[in-house]
Amino acid sequence: MMKFRFRRQGADPQREKLKQELFAFHKTVEHGFPNQPSALAFDPELRIMAIGTRSGAVKIYGAPGVEFTGLHRDAATVTQMHFLPGQGRLLTLLDDSSLHLWEIIQRNGCAHLEEGLSFHPPSRPSFDNASFPAGLTRVTVVLLAAGDTVVLGTESGSIFFLDVATLALLEGQTLSPDEVLRSVPDDYRCGKALGPVESLQGHLQDPSKILIGYSRGLLVIWSQATQSVEHVFLGNQQLESLCWGRGGSNIISSHSDGSYAIWSTDTGSPPTLQPTVVTTPYGPFPCKAINKILWRSCESGDHFIIFSGGMPRASYGDRHCVCVLRAETLVTLDFTSRVIDFFTVHSTQPEDECDNPQALAVLLEEELVVLDLQTPGWPAVPAPYLAPLHSSAITCSAHVANVPSKLWARIVSAGEQQSPQPASSALSWPITGGRNLAQEPSQRGLLLTGHEDGTVRFWDASGVALRPLYKLSTAGLFQTDCEHADSLAQAVEDDWPPFRKVGCFDPYSDDPRLGIQKVALCKYTAQMVVAGTAGQVLVLELSEVPAEHAVSVANVDLLQDREGFTWKGHERLNPHTGLLPWPAGFQPRMLIQCLPPAAVTAVTLHAEWSLVAFGTSHGFGLFDYQRKSPVLARCTLHPNDSLAMEGPLSRVKSLKKSLRQSFRRIRKSRVSGKKRTPAASSKLQEANAQLAEQTCPHDLEMTPVQRRIEPRSADDSLSGVVRCLYFADTFLRDATHHGPTMWAGTNSGSVFAYALEVPAATAGGEKRPEQAVEAVLGKEVQLMHRAPVVAIAVLDGRGRPLPEPYEASRDLAQAPDMQGGHAVLIASEEQFKVFTLPKVSAKTKFKLTAHEGCRVRKVALATFASVMSEDYAETCLACLTNLGDVHVFAVPGLRPQVHYSCIRKEDISGIASCVFTRHGQGFYLISPSEFERFSLSARNITEPLCSLDISWPQNATQPRLQESPKLSQANGTRDIILAPESCEGSPSSAHSKRADTMEPPEAALSPVSIDSAASGDTMLDTTGDVTVEYVKDFLG
């Protein structure tokens, strides 16, 4: 009989169809700067740029929103990239000497990047494949000549030619070193080889001429038309780079000793022995090699010479520089990361006599910098994308959806005022190829990232291009040691070389205590809370004009009811006193300092009540920032916690107290052993007795030995860590009167619910009266399995989460149902459970797994709108586990809806950094500099929809290899397979359709701390959980 009672019901076809209309998993776009870039290319005709990485990724960028991404099948480093100008095709060279031809193909109204042909030379041609010539070894350099020929320079000094249409070797056109040596005088040979081919350059006016540079220093002009050597330049210095002059009458070469030379090609056919100009810009002392050099002509006659490297080896050998020389002006662009490559945006039309460069683009290991070469001072051009997310290491992130247009405009205005003076370049972004087919988003989304240097950056996450808007810095409020070091460094800086700091990547943090741990933003009042590593909690407010004011400071001792503790960790940050100047933007109004100054692990803001709650590893506090007074401080450390004794939080207890607690444990174990099946009431009484005993003051009186607290991270298993905080207007005292409440969840499975007495605001007033806020402990819930509480949310009478502050009062969301019974959803690392309020009795639950290994890491309530009906939407619970799986559950029934594999379980940092949005999307870090964006919603999808204005070939590069799948992760993750991409119908369908404004609101759920991933199989189980929650009611 029981098997029929518990038999699972069959799938409802109607519900399954509805699921397909609500849920769909896509990895859509990668935001940020490519991780570990290794190659760069630019198409001057289409105005698109390509970046290759060490993991084999290929990323092509055009105008904002125009992006194409591909991944080589072999995880090898991309060493060189070359566009076929105007054709939408890209040739890549990997470090295994293989060539790959990529094409941008039009399909279903959208453009896609696909890999076409490939060429793999054998590692040992004489043994592996007799059809390949013996000299075809490692490829060192590639050139596209005359548009239809690929020229390969090799390590052996041989040069080979391939047909670009088939990537097949052209017979009888190989140029061997012996043939070149015949044109070289005998005294130059000296029995030595020419060395590898270092550079191949095509002539702009005559594509049949190829400039060849060998490592030993020999330069050769080879005529492909006549198959002969036209000119020889006998260089003696080891060659690094070559560049033609505009008209082809001059050649510039750079060398390993930090010098460059200019050679004239008008000296006739005999070998040229000496260059016309030889100079070492930073000599006479030994210098590093000039890795790459460019010569760009101007109509004014003052030509540009741009090169990387060449710095004095002893003094500045560790600098990463690109030097720009024009006439008598020399500027040394000083970067904080290694220079990968650079190019200029200039005229390439054959009829133009001069280059007239407009911009210089420098690809660095950690960022992309574009300089305006037409404006005096050569200022930087603001980048609409590819901004380095990791300019300082990311420590936390948050997403804010549906940002009001007024707040958006104020944030953008504050960001524009942060531009350096004089104003930035008037030149617009020069990489403008392609067309973005996606419509303008109907709502604005902000991505907030907290960083190690104490900054919070605001990003426009509304579309494909993640655009920087504004940067908030908190370091100016505090006294740090770096202030004196910076002034000293500026004082001793020499005038030569003329260094100029460029770029925003700064890997060094001034003070690790400045690191941002949590952020919270109220989008209706423009108030913000920022919490840091040293226990600092800042309350800020957006101002449109600069101001000068003092910041109020208040200390909140979270251990005020525990005597004899000594903090052995870092000191708190000392704030500056007196009037301080603040730029336009978010300006601090209140500084709350937690004591001990441990890292803040949870924070929440309720602007309507002017309250902020914060938690650390020692407890949590509630602060009224309107009256600038603390309301509550609660310590969550348990004296009997063995983990707290053994972990970094070490406390020495007296022998008398230890013996007393040991006898109590023995007595409790005897009682529990005799009574195997106690009644529920006796269990509750015993639990209450234990709770009363833990909080009994007489246990804390006799402490003859001082207890010492050491710093510890927020991701350990100590029970006192506060994991989440939550405000709600709900029923806690009784079922007829609702009011403000605050909820706190800890690492030990404890949930504290406080009833708040908040003075009500007058009719039409924004601020509440200046009366004190009171907090009374109402409920205390101890989960039996003691798993860490990840998130808490209150559901109204219709089972929907409560709206955010000001949402209902301003008619921006449907008012909550305050007539029916409320419920509270408590999400722990092991299970989800819904309790009725105010009795706090279990209503429904879902146990994520019955086995060890699967734990909840991130939780959020999101609204999923139907693709078929604009009026239908469901609020569901999205959950990410430590195995990288995403589960979606119905609310409040907690029935599983869909399950997707999202992140590799080995990617611990990616799982820890995941952030869900309120419309069913998410972000997580796939590298220190890149966010992967994914969507769980079938309606709300943000992905590249773009095209290129080129003539699409009917049968391009046939035969074609297997079509490349849509890239899931360009950092080399290959074990996650996505559904095929589709662009059928209007490209705006995924962006323009949104649910109505009156939609179920999202409850603010706190993020969880980082934890280590464990292996294990996921098992979804809704039965077999017989745990009992202990509830203590303090309100009666």
Swiss-Prot record:
The modification Phosphoserine is found at S662, S964, S982, S989. The modification Phosphothreonine is found at T957. One of its GO terms (cellular component) is Golgi membrane. Residues 667-677 have a biased composition (Basic residues). Residues 667-688, 980-1002 are annotated as: Disordered. It is found in: Early endosome membrane; Golgi apparatus, trans-Golgi network membrane; Cell projection, Axon; Golgi apparatus membrane. It holds the Pfam family LLGL. Signal peptide: none annotated. It comes from the Eukaryota. The keyword RNA-binding does not apply. InterPro entries: Lethal2_giant, LLGL2, WD40/YVTN_repeat-like_dom_sf, WD40_repeat_dom_sf, WD40_rpt. Residues 679-688 have a biased composition (Polar residues). WD repeats lie at residues 38-71, 78-119, 139-175, 199-233, 239-271, 289-331, 339-373, 395-473, 517-592, 601-662, 722-782, 791-843, 848-901, 915-938. Belongs to the WD repeat L(2)GL family. Complements a salt-sensitive yeast mutant (SOP-deleted mutant) and thus can regulate cation homeostasis. Associated with nonmuscle myosin II heavy chain. Interacts with PRKCI/aPKC, PARD6B/Par-6 and PARD6A. Interacts with STX4A. Interacts with RAB10 (GDP-bound form); the interaction is direct and promotes RAB10 association with membranes and activation through competition with the Rab inhibitor GDI1. Interacts with DCAF1. Cortical cytoskeleton protein found in a complex involved in maintaining cell polarity and epithelial integrity. Involved in the regulation of mitotic spindle orientation, proliferation, differentiation and tissue organization of neuroepithelial cells. Involved in axonogenesis through RAB10 activation thereby regulating vesicular membrane trafficking toward the axonal plasma membrane. This is Lethal(2) giant larvae protein homolog 1. It comes from Bos taurus.
